[in-house]
């Protein structure tokens, strides 16, 4: 329909998560209207991130070198490991300024339907970190989905088999601040009730 380079750009943009054909077209035309400097700046940023960013050799978070900034930070408490599914999950936890431990990024969650088994995740590496390190607590912060819950239980069981004195905790889940009870689904409300605490 369009010139081949435009069609190719639309096709490539539509491969991004959450970007459909129409949004890809709008983005492609935005790039065409942008200055050459801005368009080439975007292309260079994409190339640079693919060339320079890899995974931390310790926690598997995104890193520009062998280790990520968090693993290199001597002020972090290495006795506490927070387990997350993806590198993007580290960001909201860091924004709270409440957590000073280190992380372990699994690279996904268990999902037999999608063909994601324990061997496809960084679970063996997590168990090795706990076994070989001075870890006192593992905070499992996988998403509150069926896959996230299955992953959390699998990890908890794998860590119990180590027979070490390691506390395995799960992030509390429940109602967000300002939520109305009438709009809460049964699972969320049930978890909020189960996780209630004294005032």
Regions flagged by a language model, labelled:
Residues 1-6, 11, 15, 25-90:
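Cys/His-rich Zn2+-binding cysteine-cluster or related metal-binding knuckle/ribbon modules and their
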Residues 2, 99, 127-199:
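Long C-terminal interaction/binding lobes of large macromolecular proteins
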Residues 14, 32, 47, 60, ...:
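Signal for well-folded cores of large energy- and translation-related assemblies
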Residues 17, 36, 49, 61, ...:
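Conserved phosphate/pyrophosphate-binding and hydrolysis machinery centered on Walker-type P-loop NTPases
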Residues 24, 72-142:
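Extended interfacial segments that mediate partner engagement and assembly in macromolecular machines
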Residues 38, 43-48, 57, 69-70, ...:
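Core recognition of P-loop NTPase motor domains used across DNA-transaction enzymes
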């Amino acid at each position: 329909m369009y010139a081949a380079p435009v069609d190719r750009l639309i096709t490539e943009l539509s491969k991004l998560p959450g970007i459909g054909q129409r949004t890809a077209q709008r983005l492609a035309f935005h790039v065409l209207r942008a200055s050459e400097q801005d368009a080439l700046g975007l292309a260079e940023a994409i190339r640079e991130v693919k060339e320079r960013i890899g995974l931390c050799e310790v926690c598997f978070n995104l890193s520009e070198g062998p280790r990520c900034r968090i693993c290199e930070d001597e002020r972090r408490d290495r006795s506490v490991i927070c387990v997350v599914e993806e590198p993007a999950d580290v960001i909201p936890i860091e924004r709270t300024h409440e957590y000073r431990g280190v992380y372990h990024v699994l690279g996904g969650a268990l999902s037999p339907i999608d063909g994601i088994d324990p061997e496809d995740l960084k679970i063996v590496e997590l168990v090795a970190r706990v076994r070989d390190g001075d870890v006192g607590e593992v905070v499992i912060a996988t998403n509150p989905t069926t896959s996230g819950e299955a992953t959390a239980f699998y990890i908890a069981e794998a860590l119990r088999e180590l027979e070490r004195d390691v506390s395995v905790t799960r992030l509390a889940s429940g109602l967000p601040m300002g939520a109305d009870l009438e709009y809460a689904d049964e699972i969320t409300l049930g978890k909020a009730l189960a996780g209630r605490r004294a005032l």
